[in-house]
Amino acid sequence: MFDFAFAIPLMRRAIYPGSFDPVTNGHLDIIERARKLFDEVIVAVAHNDEKQPLLPLKERLDLLRETAGKMDNVRIAQFKGLLVEFARAEKAGAVIRGLRAVSDFEFEFQMALMNRKLDAGVETIFLMPKEEYTYLSSRIVKEIARLGGDVSGFVPPAVANTLSKKFAPSHS
């Protein structure tokens, strides 16, 4: 029997980038599995002046620290600019990307090829979430919360609490 775990040398450091607006149970599933493959996983929150996230950067970082930051070998960070430059600065040899469905693949594949062109020393590793999270996205979670739905099955408790406050009806 072939033991696959011994066939792959442990890469030292990987980056799992995203906007995490907000972090979902699907994100946490990818983080949990990625941390078993690498010595360190840096969960990197992208700061993009062109986008208007629901949650400010500091709040996204705080929620990630509360939910994933306590995991062994996981570090929460932020970055602005090119991901491969951040990876180079952090001496990371891999970028982790989650693929929920075939529809994610085309975009992620193009990004992986572009990142390889920019820096051939950074590999992209695709991980699929557990089946129960394949439909889950931050966008869908925000829409459910905005419409008054219960998101507690899709996000950690701290995130559900934050979203319920964010979308609470105002009593004017």
Locate predicted features.
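Nucleotidyltransferase catalytic core that binds NTPs
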Residues: 2-172
